[in-house]
């Protein structure tokens, strides 16, 4: 085989859980350990950096996981990945598992710890953040959380959690330009054919859209009342306040002003009545609808 380039990495995966050992591989603990060590040693001769993943690590006996991790580090692994392959783990459990490895693997300080989470129970982002709190410094995931079955960790959500909650993650910086997050999200959606749900955190079209009149009024007064992130920091434009039947008079007046439409105060009650009727007929009242209502007065 030809040696890899200077910036290349070989990623090796060996399943370690009892379920995989019995039903998929038909091998004992010792056979699995020997397979992993031999593979890592061979890869280390070909590449400057080897990553080892213990597939289904979250359902592997902690003591065996610690044993195999120690062995592959001695064999030359530089990155150790602890996957939650079937999205089985809860955040507290994941934190404990990473902490266990850090305290029970003598040579763990020689490597970078990584996690790879699946979202079968909606825990991929939470588990990844718990792992970071436990000391992991590599997170594997995908744009928009796409992936096998229910998907993988949504990287944009992890990035913005780290960015927005520096009180929790004071030692972690990603170096990522957060104002570029929306663009790759749209690109991935277009290329994969997998639409981003409107309600998806961070990059969903409704992530910063406020339909309730109470919410709109609060956001117009101060965005921090209902927003914990600045949409422009993510790559969105300014906060969107779509008009719906729940929108209040203040929001309607603000939109009229933005559109350059002037309505006498005496006509506002009638306009608002017409606006409410239009809102009952459709989900959103668009700018053209509002202009038509003004013309009808």
Regions found by a protein language model. Give the residues of each.
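A mid-to-C-terminal "edge-of-domain" accessory segment
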Residues: 160-162, 167-297
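Flexible glycine/proline-rich, aromatic-decorated loop/lid segments
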Residues: 6, 123-138, 146-164, 207-231
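Beta-strand segments within the central parallel beta-sheet cores of soluble alpha/beta enzyme folds
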Residues: 82, 110-117, 141-144, 171-183
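Alpha/beta enzyme core
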Residues: 1-113, 129-136
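Generic beta-strand/beta-sheet core signal
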Residues: 13, 53-55, 83, 114-118, ...
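Predominant activation on well-ordered alpha-helical scaffold segments within soluble catalytic domains
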Residues: 37-41, 66-70, 95-102, 126-133, ...
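Active-site loop-helix segments enriched in His/Asp/Glu that coordinate
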Residues: 1-3, 27-29, 61-68, 141-169
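Acidic, glycine-rich active-site loops and adjacent beta-strand->loop/helix elements
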Residues: 16-18, 56-58, 86, 117-122, ...
């Amino acid at each position: 085989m030809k040696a890899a380039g200077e910036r290349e990495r070989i990623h090796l995966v060996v399943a370690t859980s009892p379920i995989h050992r019995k039903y998929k591989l038909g091998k004992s603990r010792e056979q699995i350990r020997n397979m992993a060590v031999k593979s890592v040693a061979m890869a280390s001769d070909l590449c400057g950096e080897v990553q080892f993943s213990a597939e289904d690590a979250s359902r592997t006996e902690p003591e065996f996981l610690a044993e195999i991790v120690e062995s592959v580090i001695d064999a030359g692994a530089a990155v150790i990945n602890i996957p939650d392959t079937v999205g089985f783990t809860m955040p507290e459990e994941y934190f404990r598992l990473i902490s266990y490895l850090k305290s029970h693997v003598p040579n763990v300080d020689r490597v970078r710890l990584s996690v790879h989470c699946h979202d079968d129970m909606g825990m991929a982002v939470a588990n990844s953040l718990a792992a970071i709190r436990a000391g992991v410094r590599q997170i594997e995931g995908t744009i928009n959380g796409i992936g096998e079955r229910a998907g993988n960790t949504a990287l944009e959500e992890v990035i913005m959690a780290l960015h927005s909650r520096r009180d929790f993650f004071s030692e972690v910086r990603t170096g990522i330009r957060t104002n570029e997050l929306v663009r790759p999200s749209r690109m991935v959606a277009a290329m994969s054919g997998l639409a981003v749900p409107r309600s998806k955190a961070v990059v969903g079209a409704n992530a910063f859209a406020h339909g309730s009149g109470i919410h709109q009024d609060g956001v117009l007064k101060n965005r921090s009342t209902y927003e914990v992130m600045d949409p422009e920091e993510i790559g969105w434009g300014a906060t969107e306040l779509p008009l719906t039947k729940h929108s209040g008079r203040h929001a309607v007046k603000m939109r009229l002003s933005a559109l350059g439409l002037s309505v006498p105060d005496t006509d506002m009650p009638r306009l608002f009545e017409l606006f409410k009727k239009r809102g009952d007929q459709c989900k959103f009242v668009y700018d053209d609808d509002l202009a038509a209502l003004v013309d009808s007065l």
